[in-house]
Amino acid sequence: MEKFDVTGMTCAACSAHVERAVRGVEGVKEVTVSLLTNSMTVDFSSPATAEKICAAVSAAGYGASPQNQGGKNENKKTLLESNEPKKILYRLIASAVLLLPLMYVSMGHLMWGWPLPEIFASDPLAIGLYQLLLTTAVMVINQRFFISGTKSLLHGAPNMDTLVSLGSAAAYIYSTAVLFEMCHAAVNGDIQTAMHHLHGLYYESAAMILTLITVGKYLEAVSKGRTTDAIKSLMDLAPKTACVIRDGKEQVIPAEEVVKGDTFVVRPGESIPVDGRVISGGSAVDESALTGESIPVDKAPGSLVSAATLNQNGFLTCEATRVGEDTTLSQIIETVENAAATKAPIAKIADKVSGVFVPAVMAIALVAGAAWLISGRPFSFALARAISVLVISCPCALGLATPVAIMVGSGVGAKHGVLFKTASALEQTGKTQIVVLDKTGTLTKGKPQVTDILPASGYDADSLLRLAASLESKSEHPLAAAITRRAGESNVETDEAQGFTALPGHGVRAEINGKTAIGGNAALIKSKGMLDADMKALGERLADEGKTPLYFAFDGRITGIIAVADVVKEDSGQAISELKDMGIRTVMLTGDNRRTALSVAKQTGIDEVVSDVLPGDKAEVVEKLRKYGKVAMVGDGINDAPALTQADIGIAIGAGADVALDAADVVLMKSSVGDVAAAIRLSRQTLRNIHENLFWAFFYNCIGIPIAAGALIPAFNIALNPMLGAAAMSLSSFCVVTNALRLNFFKPDRPFKGKSKQPAELPKLMPTEENIKNTEETAMKKTVYINGMMCSHCTAHVQKALGALDGVESVEVSLEDKKAVLTLNKNVDDAVITAAVREAGYEPIKCE
């Protein structure tokens, strides 16, 4: 895959011709030409080469060159800040300066009775020659229309410039022929005939057409420049210099000279130059430029930092981990540009029309002129109709309808931390009917947290937390880490634990201040005779809520329960509610047990739950759900990669620095489910904008061309002046681009407004559950009782180990009952099952 810069394209017909020319090169697999960015992406292999591709473009009448890969960001900024609008403005001003006196002399005295200079008052030939000179000057100033139009016509691919140049040249040549008639009459002394011919001059039309088209081109160029504002603002954020430490001294060098492994420092108020890892220091970093997150993120040793983010209040020393084109900022820019360079499926309609549009318009103009001549109208009248058809038609509006909306939409998404990898992803995301969400890390925070501290009689919360943190301080279990982390956050001091012992399948034991402390599951406390009915009931209630209750006892007496769970993110419920308001069904897909999954579903409002699914089986569930509508799968992009790939749209959430996730079509920089709804809303608004643009482009041409040809003359005697046709054409592209710019007003946190779509119809039982139910009726089952399981992580580990056995159809693990129920499609020996449990680190009691 290689990118090329293309020069000489002015409209959709040009890009279509370039695309056809490159497709004709042997070895070219795929080619996409972007009129908006004047670029081309080509996927090719031998015998095709970059030189052959450039030669094919050159033979088609355009220019092409491989994009320079060195100093890429600087080149991109230069290309985005094109001085094309300034060049067009100079031409426009010069044309207008000449057009005003031309219009005064040609039409002012006829329409408004304005006085003429004495030299013109009685000499029609002087008026004609004056118009000839001014019009010729305007045509020279705007010679690019004639050069481009003629070149395209000679290559058999007429474009918009061909239409403009033909219309203007026809008026100019006809007027010059009339001027010769005037000269002949004047030489023969027939001033009256010469004065009569004066009304047949169309020089002002030729000049006005070129000037008005230039007005439209200027407005279009300015508007197109604004479509890349989001990318340019990101580039502006990148610092130009970095302060690195080399040979023990601080040195300020250009940011692009920082290499991987360099140590750099960032002072308060400075932007971080490259991606890195904090070595020392601490600060709050504003990452809103990359993620759209307005709240600064705390950084400490070991934390990752990204280029173009702002260090607010601390001194950071960091090690460079990703530099140059590998930084998060560069990947974001690359992603947005790739999206703009690809074509949305909806653009194929405009592409097909653009390929035949200009020849069709030329044919219509010829037929219209001939028809009026045959009907008996004067040649000047017929010529005016043909010229009107040529100059009112606008292939540019068709060609720009989709890409400008894609460019603005993808840029706006990037500004808010939503990255669409392709134009197709931006179009298809809005058509989502079912959103499937992973639980851990997507709906929940992804790491266990203490949710409840419930001391027994005679103890308070702080003393219970102190005991638990002291006891768990030497444990490596994730649940222990949650307790010690909570103690640190609460500034609770801990005591030294002596003789720490892990009790597999039950908990831990240690000596604290010379007395025995134990902590773990209910079975451990019960075995010591310390579990009363109230504490048991309290623990069961916590378990029903999807939490893991941990019981603690000290010196032979129970001290309380601390519940730990992977808590639901604060915005998950609101995000699910918004998705429902948009007419989207929500499904949770998780490998966790059903009790925990249902608890999370209840908290968030999820429609359907599919639990106890192994990572490898998630793709199968997604495939079955696709029967009921378009599916978007939301996950972390790594463990869920097969499911993301299987879905119609794969959405990777919380990607952070890993923008280039291969499995995802859409990358969300933040770990916020709310951004899923924002991505769908942005896609829908972009698609609606494309529909509006295409409607305007087709409506304008379908209505404008017949009127220009004279369709209203028989019934209403309304004829369109060529100058009005040129004015309409000059505004059509501007209207399309301006409409696309409205997407800049998109707000990701704005609640959905409008009529909801009909939710996708899903069966009451999800496909996998249905299969399990049917299988249970016919398949063989075995139950293995297990010691050692303490939390949902343990059950997931056991489920994975047993699910991997040959002949095991499904596995249901119960933490409460300390057992696993296996559904088999063939006989599996008990010894094989117990061996798998033992290898997973747990103790099988019996198998039946």
Located regions from the model:
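Transmembrane helix-loop-helix hairpins at the membrane interface
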Residues: 87-241, 352, 717-722
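Flexible metal-binding regulatory segments at protein termini and peripheral loops
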Residues: 1-126, 249-250, 334-342, 747-848
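Conserved cytosolic catalytic loops of P-type ATPases
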Residues: 26-45, 50, 55, 200-203, ...
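ATP-driven catalytic headpiece of P-type ATPases
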Residues: 90, 309, 430-476, 506-587, ...
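Juxtamembrane coupling segments of multi-pass membrane pumps/enzymes
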Residues: 76, 182, 191-194, 207-268, ...
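Membrane-embedded alpha-helical bundles of multi-pass transporters
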Residues: 111-126, 154, 173, 412, ...
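Conserved ATP-binding TGD loop and adjacent catalytic N/P-domain core of P-type ATPases
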Residues: 16, 432, 512-514, 538, ...
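Hydrophobic alpha-helical transmembrane segments
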Residues: 136-145, 152, 169, 205-234, ...
